[in-house]
Amino acid sequence: MTLAAIGQICSTASIKGNLEQCVRLVGKAARGGAKVLFLPEASDYIATDAQASLDLAVAQSSSPFVLGLQEAAKTNGVAIHVGIHHRPVPAQVPDEKEDSKATAAGRILNRAIYIAADGRIDDSNTYDKLHVFDYGSLRESATVQPGSRLTAPFDSPVGRIGSLICFDLRFPEASLSLAQPGPPSRWHGRPAQLLTYPSAFTLRTGEAHWETLLRARAIETQSWVVAAAQVGRHNPKRASYGRSIAVDPWGKVAVRLKGVTDAEGSAEEGAVEEIGFFDVDLDEVDRVRREMPLLRRIDVYSEV
């Protein structure tokens, strides 16, 4: 078993302040003995409106937030999985379809990155959110260009990670595609053992669906599911549900953090910059998949 940590913050428009929150969590994770720390979606910033979000976005390679987390990972010897915003620079990456599409549309990318314990980032492990969130007054599509591909599961100290982000949670096809064995040609026969959903759920959708959906994804994929969440009020217009959670392949909650206390988005005492620890047992993944094989009838319905 390997010890992992999950942390939650309350991002604002202050990138410097958000980095400071995250760096403190990296230190807590290291002192607790964790090998990997999972942080929420949009950890770099949550702006007050669409234009402000576009104005704050920079390229991942020059982001002071990302550079600061790389240094924190290296200093503390802890790998970090985190959600950020990325402004494409097409001249530097002419072959990246997501970058080209986003630039043409004047939009940015909602991205999950993995920073190794030595501070390095392997771009092949980067994932751009496929399903953007348009609900109520929130219109993510106004600023975010959807990604166009899944990222192959990649190795980490806590197993092979399959990256997804927040609203992707409502589309089980994505998690099934990452985690089910399938033909040898899929992921070279190396499906995900742990799925991530860095998130910033609204209060209404969080109360109704958050834990139910996450446990369902864990049960149907027979994988670990880790969802680090934003918590509390970011600005007068927006608040997040919190309750970061890790679920084992049998659907049992391994750790659950605090959340909001009321309809105004007030965070429980200690919820902001809270961290939780859990042991990732990859033998449990193998055992559950072996004892309850999910033999899909693709002769009757289409394979995902």
Show where each model-derived region lies.
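C-terminal beta-strand edge segments of enzyme domains
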Residues: 224, 230-304
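Active-site catalytic loop in hydrolytic enzyme cores
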Residues: 58-60, 71, 88-190, 198, ...
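Short polar catalytic/cofactor-binding loops
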Residues: 8-15
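Cys-nucleophile CN-hydrolase/nitrilase-fold catalytic domain and related Cys-dependent amidase chemistry
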Residues: 15, 24-120, 203-216, 220-223
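Short beta-strand scaffold segments in enzyme catalytic cores
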Residues: 82-84, 110-114, 152-154, 244-246, ...
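Extreme N-terminal starter segment of soluble prokaryotic enzymes
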Residues: 1-5
